[in-house]
Curated annotation (Swiss-Prot):
Name of the encoding gene: infB
Organism phylogeny: Bacteria, Pseudomonadati, Pseudomonadota, Alphaproteobacteria, Hyphomicrobiales
Region of interest (G4), residue spans: 500-503
Protein's name according to its UniProt entry: Translation initiation factor IF-2
Keywords noted in UniProt: Cytoplasm, GTP-binding, Initiation factor, Nucleotide-binding, Protein biosynthesis
Organism of provenance: Rhodopseudomonas palustris (strain BisA53)
Pfam family name, one: GTP_EFTU_D2
Length: 893
């Protein structure tokens, strides 16, 4: 229900958005309600007339008039709070008046509602209930949302409160320290300055009792909550008795608190000013402001420009350049913008631009290259007075099965050949042998003789002092023998020829000496300067003479080095051991390698955890020409990498990061170089149809892995090639099986095995894992598998020719050619060509071959027959039918 414009109209009206109400006959008025702090609000109130009989109006109005009479106003007090107004009496709700109209002063009786009005009222009440239910649900959802938000906000507030308390505690400690410092300074200032404020405070104390009564009011109004002598902090509590008279509640007296120190008191009030024992001192905030002012004046003074020497590499970021110059990066970017270049703070600029910026800002520039991090690692010249003789390093080289390892076993009194798979050497090994005559040690390096291990032989020749060329007396000079000669000459080391297997009946040492002349190796017996010794590793013949020749050659070389310097060496072999981690076989060439040294080899670094000799013993250090196994690398280095000891880990990280970057760039240039050239595009078009054989290779050492990759690379052709998805050192893991599953690849394990999880995953996913111990078997199997991907060769074999004499139309068969075989034979089911005027018009197969209405398999030359083609009928007299057979021949690599 809504009220109409006419206040006297009592008719009912229904609004669809409001509930049904009855408009009462009331009179309205306004009352101004007062609040604390001087705030007021105008409130609309309802005036109700009360029916009075006779002269009862006089006595009824008496209490109201008495209550409305204002109390005498007290004298104005500055510190008293404003008197709050009494709240208006609660008004009765309109619903009670509507429900009981007979009690109103007007005495009006409502009429009975009609059916339409009752229906409208019921509809309005139903709508109101639905709306109330929706509002209740919305309110509950809002409360739930606020509760969750309040929980998060509460946690944030608690964290902020903890930070604030910690900050306040820190400030409190700082202020306490400053306060103590100021007290100490005042104490030193002198006692006279402290007496003067005390004398000035004495008359103020005597005047305090007389000043207090003047500030108190003479008469206090009821309900006023101020107390004489108090601050404007809040009103006093007022208690009213049963008669309505207000009486103040007197709070219990508190014990007088001790006066706080002058440094800790707050605002200056009248009471504190009159009762203070000394003059007010300077506050901590004032002292802090003065200090900040002095600092501000000092900062406004012009500062002297600091000139720095800036090290500028080949490429540097703007942020790094600004840090090295102690300048703001914004200033550097602004200078680049003046030159017309837009850059961000993390952009990389070249050395020339960086030098220009640094010089413009007044700094000096020192240009360095990225490779300068490797300066001082190798080839440091030693003082000749600090050098001492060292043992020679001898590399045994030669063709496969010429007895290199057997000769070394005879010298070492060991049996290495039996430990190698297939009785052939597939790893490079380093050993030390003590000469029985001189007692001096000789370091031997055994290299494989297979064609696949060319890189191993090259590494052995680089780190050696003397090369022993082993040639079998019954076999002579072979391809790998020639390769070993070339490696030795490239390294510039002397050669000692060991003619082995002289115990065999067909041994011909003179033939070996003569064949060596073709490769510029002239032995002493033929007038040259190359030493040759006839030995037998099986019978241990002339081994002492061979050791004597090695010692003599070492004396001629005068091998010396400094043992008291950081170690340098070469990684002979590297592998990933399951129990020990990355293990590298290192030949120390200069200095002494100790446990705990920080080492760098290639792109890997580490700290030496243990050193193991060739005999399997753990040692604390390794001197020059000593081969050891080094444990402690972060990852297995590559065979052939040079090892160096650095002073700290920071230098090691710089070197390894530079080398890793160079390695990535080299790999990127090999794979993505010349992509835009025409030749590269043409080669890519040719290799689009090339089939790939995906492989994952895991080997025991880096050298074997390198040899396998080189051999597989040579197997590739224009039609098929091996695609190496991953190649690494160590056992076959589950991640290798997962990678093979994605590309349907074959996993090859060379002298390694798969762990239990990897084997189970391979069996579950159908991934083939092949294990090998001999490199030749691995290469042969991959060669056969890749040959299966080659398209077979198709070869045609001519059978014979036939001439068509006449064409016959036969029902249910179609056209049949009557032919005479001119040469050879014609077979049913063979491939045929239809030639007309020396032009091939059709190629297909014979569907029918008859002779005198009988199906035959073949027809000989000179005989007549009937022929029909499959799905072809356009045959004419005079055409020639050529019959041939296609043979499929499997290809191989």
């Amino acid at each position: 229900m809504v009220d109409t414009k006419n206040p006297g109209d009592k008719t009912l009206s229904v609004s669809p958005s409001k509930t049904l109400t009855l408009k009462p006959r009331v009179e309205q008025g306004t009352v101004r309600q007062s609040f604390s702090h001087g705030r007021t609000k105008q409130v609309v109130v309802e005036k109700r007339g009360k029916r009075r009989i006779g002269g009862e109006g006089g006595p009824a109005d008496a209490p109201t008039a008495a209550a409305a009479a204002p109390a005498p106003a007290p004298a104005p007090v500055p510190s008293a709070a404003p008197r709050p107004a009494a709240p208006p009496p609660p008004s009765r709700p309109q619903q009670s008046r509507s429900q009981s109209p007979s009690r109103s002063g007007s005495g009006v009786v409502l009429r009975t509602l009609t059916e339409d009005e009752r229906s409208a009222r019921a509809t309005a009440l139903a709508d109101a209930r639905v709306r109330d239910e929706e509002e209740r649900r919305a309110a509950e959802a809002e409360v739930a949302r606020r509760n969750s938000a309040e929980g998060i906000a509460q946690a944030e507030r608690e964290a902020a409160e903890a930070r604030r308390k910690a900050e306040e505690e820190r400030h409190r400690h700082e202020e306490e320290a400053k306060r103590k410092a100021e007290l100490e300074a005042k104490r030193r200032f002198g006692e006279e300055e402290a007496k003067r404020p005390a004398a000035a405070a004495t008359p103020a104390k005597s005047a305090t009792p007389a000043a207090r009564p003047t500030g108190a009011p003479a008469v206090r109004a009821p309900g006023v909550a101020a107390e004489a002598g108090d601050d404007d902090e809040g009103p006093r509590q007022v208690r009213r008795g049963p008669g309505g008279a207000a009486r103040p509640v007197i709070p219990p007296k508190q014990p007088a608190a001790k006066p706080a120190p002058s440094k800790q008191r707050g605002r200056l009030t009248l009471v504190t000013a009159l009762t203070a024992d000394d003059v007010r001192e300077r506050s901590i905030a004032s002292f802090r402001r003065r200090t900040q002012r002095l600092k501000g004046h000092a900062s406004n003074e012009p500062k002297e420009k600091l000139v720095r020497e800036v090290i500028v590499p080949e490429a540097i970021t703007i942020q790094e350049l600004a840090n090295r110059m102690s300048e703001r990066a914004v200033d550097v970017i602004r200078m680049l913008m003046k030159q017309g270049a837009m850059h961000k703070i993390n952009d990389v600029i070249d050395a020339d631009t960086a030098q220009l910026i640094a010089e413009e800002l007044g700094h000096t520039v020192k240009r360095v290259a990225a490779s300068d991090v490797e300066e001082g690692l190798f080839d440091v010249v030693d003082n000749s007075t600090d050098t001492e003789p060292r043992s020679p390093v001898v590399t045994v080289m030669g063709h496969v099965d010429h007895g290199k390892t057997s000769l070394l076993d005879a010298l070492r009194h060991a049996n290495v050949v039996s430990g190698e798979a297939g009785g052939i050497t597939q790893h490079i090994g380093a050993y030390q042998v003590t000469s029985p005559e001189s007692g001096k040690k000789i370091t031997f390096i055994d290299t494989p003789g297979h064609a696949a291990f060319t890189a191993m032989r090259a590494r052995g020749a680089k780190v050696t002092d003397i090369v022993i060329l082993v040639v079998a007396a019954d076999d002579g000079v072979m391809p790998q023998t020639v390769e070993a000669i070339n490696h030795a000459k490239a390294a510039g080391v002397p050669i000692i020829v060991a003619i082995n297997k002289i115990d065999k009946p067909d041994a011909k040492p003179e033939r070996v000496r003569t064949e060596l002349l073709q490769y510029n190796v002239q032995v002493e017996s033929l007038g040259g300067d190359t030493v040759d010794v006839e030995v037998s590793a099986k019978n241990k013949t002339n081994l002492d003479k061979l050791l004597e020749m090695i010692a003599l050659q070492a004396e001629l070389l005068d091998l010396k080095t400094n043992e008291q310097r950081p170690a340098e060496g070469t990684v002979i072999e590297a592998k990933l051991d399951r129990g020990r981690g990355p293990v590298a076989t290192v030949l120390v060439q200069r200095g002494t390698l100790k446990v705990g040294d920080i080492i760098v080899a290639g792109a890997e670094m580490g700290r030496v955890r243990a050193l193991i000799s060739d005999q399997g013993d753990t040692v604390e250090s390794a001197g020059p020409s000593v081969p050891v196994e080094v444990l402690g690398f972060n990852g297995p280095p590559e065979a052939g990498d040079r090892l160096a000891v650095v002073e700290n880990e920071a230098r090691a990280r710089q070197v390894t990061s530079y080398r890793a970057h160079q390695k990535r760039e080299k790999a990127a240039s090999l794979t993505g170089g010349m992509r835009g050239s025409l030749e590269q595009m043409m080669s890519q078009l040719k290799t689009v149809g090339r089939k790939e054989f995906p492989l994952i290779i895991k080997a025991d050492v880096q050298g074997s892995l390198e040899a396998i990759l080189g051999s597989l690379e040579k197997l590739g052709t224009e039609e098929v090639a091996a695609r190496i998805l991953h190649a690494g050192v160590g056992g076959i893991s589950e991640s290798d099986v997962t990678l093979a599953e994605g590309f349907n690849a074959v996993i090859l394990g060379f002298s390694v095995r798969a762990n239990k999880e990897a084997a189970a995953a391979a069996k579950r996913n159908g991934i083939e894992i092949r294990y090998y111990n001999i490199i030749y078997d691995l290469v042969d199997d991959i060669k056969k598998a890749m040959s299966g991907l080659l398209a077979p060769t198709l070869r045609e074999t001519m059978l014979g020719n036939a001439l068509i004499l006449e064409i016959f139309n036969i029902s249910k068969v179609g056209k049949v050619a009557g032919c005479r075989v001119t040469d050879g034979t014609v077979e049913r089911g063979a491939n045929v060509r239809l030639i007309r005027d020396n032009v091939v018009v059709h190629e297909g197969k014979l569907s029918t071959l008859k002779r005198f209405k009988d199906e035959v398999k073949e027809v000989q030359s000179g005989q007549e027959c009937g022929m029909a083609f499959e799905n072809y009928t356009d045959m004419r007299a005079g055409d020639v039918i050529e019959c041939y057979r296609v043979e499929t021949i499997q290809r191989s690599l």
